[in-house]
Regions:
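A membrane-topology feature that recognizes alpha-helical transmembrane segments
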Residues: 1-155
Length: 155
């Protein structure tokens, strides 16, 4: 049995990783939209949709920045929108729950699983593929929620 501190640390890190991928999902949805509209002015940095100012790195921290700024741009004080916050939060929670379902049993049964590395590898592969699938589904969900359609860039 693994120490509770390690388990909590892993679960917190997986929540943070999920929030980061939730932020990525929103950015990717916008990139697909720009690609679908054949717009070329999509830069490398996140910008406010209203004032077009570049968002600083410390205003781009998933969940925390949205809460600190109360869902508004630091420069023009216009609403950012709750979709970004919700995707970060929901993917963070989803990563946490999947980690609880897949990783905690692995950590708690490490001595047994070490005798069967093929089972351990299979369980970890299923876990990673499930996380990747969740990220893709979140990108599609954000795209659908914002524009009421699915991107043709996937076809």
């Amino acid at each position: 049995m693994v120490d509770t501190t390690i388990t909590v640390f892993i679960l917190v890190m997986m929540f943070i990783l999920g929030a980061v991928f939730g932020s990525f999902a929103c950015c990717q949805a916008w990139r697909w939209r720009y690609h679908a509209l054949k717009k070329k002015d999509l830069g490398q940095w996140s910008v406010c949709l209203h004032c077009k100012k570049r968002i600083k790195w410390y205003d781009n921290i998933p969940i925390i920045s949205w809460l600190v700024l109360r869902g508004k741009c630091r420069n023009c004080h216009k609403e950012i929108g709750i979709a970004d916050f919700l995707s970060e939060l929901s993917l963070g929670v989803a990563f946490l729950m999947l980690s609880w379902a897949y990783l905690v049993p692995i950590l708690n049964n490490w001595s047994v699983l070490a005798l069967h590395p093929e089972f351990l590898a299979l369980r970890l592969a299923i876990f990673i593929v499930t996380l990747m699938l969740l990220v893709v589904l979140m990108v599609l969900a954000v795209y659908d929620a914002k524009w009421g359609e699915l991107p043709t860039v996937l076809l």
